[in-house]
A protein has these predicted regions:
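Terminal connector regions
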Residues: 26, 30-33, 137-165
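A short beta-turn/strand-edge loop motif at beta-sheet boundaries
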Residues: 74-79, 141-143
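Short amphipathic beta-strand and strand-loop transition segments with alternating hydrophobic
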Residues: 53-60, 108-111
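Short strand-edge motifs at loop-to-beta-strand transitions and within beta-strands
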Residues: 129-135
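The feature marks short-to-medium sequence segments in extracytoplasmic or secretory-pathway proteins
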Residues: 76-125
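Asparagine-centered strand-capping/turn motif at beta-strand->loop junctions
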Residues: 68-74
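Structural beta-strand segments of beta-rich domains
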Residues: 63-65
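Membrane engagement elements in two modes
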Residues: 1-52
């Protein structure tokens, strides 16, 4: 009789252990699936993003630069505070410019569709739109130099354009 009791307890422990193991395995697979889907969504968004710098204009003794960008991708772009703007100078130095209305800083001066200010989804950089940003530098760029501005979206797609004064 004692052996039957011990056998039943052992079988119950084996079943409990198997169920516990299976539950842990299923939870792990579920977490992996969620992570995989998130990574795939991010990769898809990145594949569908294409931004191109098309023109630059420098003024105010080299301390202000206007850059026009085109959204040639299939993604509407937002989160401008998570974008990076980096100015690399001809002398080798580089500066990260924050998204700010102060100096140094960069801000959006307009988003346009076919040359007209946007009316559909304001403050969202939609496909086929053009956006103009203004970069304000603490110290203007040196005359007769060629410098490089790099604009990078929140998902890592970037475009570069030279500018000078």
């Amino acid at each position: 009789m004692e052996n039957i009791f011990i056998t039943i307890v052992c079988i119950a422990l084996i079943i409990l252990g198997g169920v516990s193991y299976a539950t842990s395995a299923l939870n792990s697979v579920d977490k992996l699936t969620v992570s995989w889907k998130a990574a795939e969504a991010y990769a898809q968004e990145t594949r569908e993003t294409d931004v191109k710098a098309i023109s630059s204009e420098t003024y105010d003794n080299g301390s202000n630069i206007d850059i026009s960008l085109e959204n040639n991708g299939d993604q509407s772009l937002v989160n401008f505070d998570k974008w990076d703007v980096i100015v690399r100078y001809q002398d080798g130095g580089a500066t990260w410019i924050p998204y700010s209305t102060s100096t140094p800083g960069w801000s959006i001066t307009g988003i346009y569709y076919n040359g007209q200010p946007e009316v559909y989804e304001p403050n969202i950089f939609n496909p086929s739109e053009t956006m103009t940003i203004n970069i304000r530098l603490s110290d203007g760029v040196t005359e007769n130099t060629t410098n490089l501005a790099t604009i990078s979206t929140y998902n890592g797609i970037h475009s570069q354009i030279p500018f000078g004064w």
